Regions:
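Structured, helix-rich domain cores that form ligand/interaction pockets
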Residues: 1-207
Length: 208
């Protein structure tokens, strides 16, 4: 818990495993999960290591804690490097969000959908698909996906305003226009971005 800067005794601890991993226990507080107590193996005779997972809410919680200390996620990544060394930790997934809260959005999800249908985009994968769900009697909430979710880089574009309305029983007037672009990075791409952000935190300042 040194990286998070949180005391161990505030976590709930229970037995849990992860597929293809040797962890035997999980520490949880809210939407922050740390798997550890690795089973000793020939490759890991001391049973060292842990696996940190934070959902979107978990990231929001850690952001507030870091911000209260005048720190950023970049500082947290630097702490990882100082504590474990450059080659002894890695990111398996990192989701980057870009929010457009302009009254007139830079683009709508419907416009992105039409671009995909006309194949007016460049990506490592030609795959794309759409999801649409009922929002009210006259409208739907839309999501566009480009590339497979398991690929090294994939994109999601969706109506964040309608998602917030549905989750928190608010109106669009209360929430305001809010379109979100998410880049989902995995493995080498996730780690490379985190290390770039560590050294150049200004690349995320507009979002913050």
């Amino acid at each position: 818990m040194h990286i998070l800067g949180l005391p161990t005794d505030i976590f709930n601890v229970y037995p849990a495993s992860i597929k293809y991993k040797t962890y035997q226990a999980r520490w949880q507080i809210g939407d922050i999960y740390v798997s550890g107590d690795a089973r000793k193996t020939e490759d890991n005779p001391q049973g060292l290591g842990c696996y940190l997972v934070m959902t979107g809410r978990g990231c929001d919680d850690i952001f507030r804690i870091l911000d209260s200390r005048n720190c950023t996620f970049g500082d947290m990544f630097k702490h990882c490097e100082r504590r474990y060394g450059q080659d002894n930790f890695h990111f398996t997934r990192l989701d980057i969000a870009i929010d457009d809260k302009n009254e007139k959005p830079f683009f709508t999800i419907e416009q992105i959908k039409k671009k995909c249908e006309k194949e007016e985009f460049i990506s490592n994968s030609e795959g794309y698909h759409f999801d649409e769900s009922k929002f009210d009697d006259f409208d739907t909430a839309k999501t566009v996906y480009i590339s497979a979710g398991k690929s090294g880089l994939s994109y999601r574009f969706y109506d964040k305003d309608k998602e917030v309305c549905s989750k928190h029983n608010k109106t669009l007037d209360e929430v305001g226009s809010w379109k979100r672009t998410e880049m989902q990075l995995r493995d080498d791409k996730a780690h490379a971005f985190a290390m770039t952000f560590k050294d150049r935190p200004q690349i995320g300042r507009a979002h913050v």
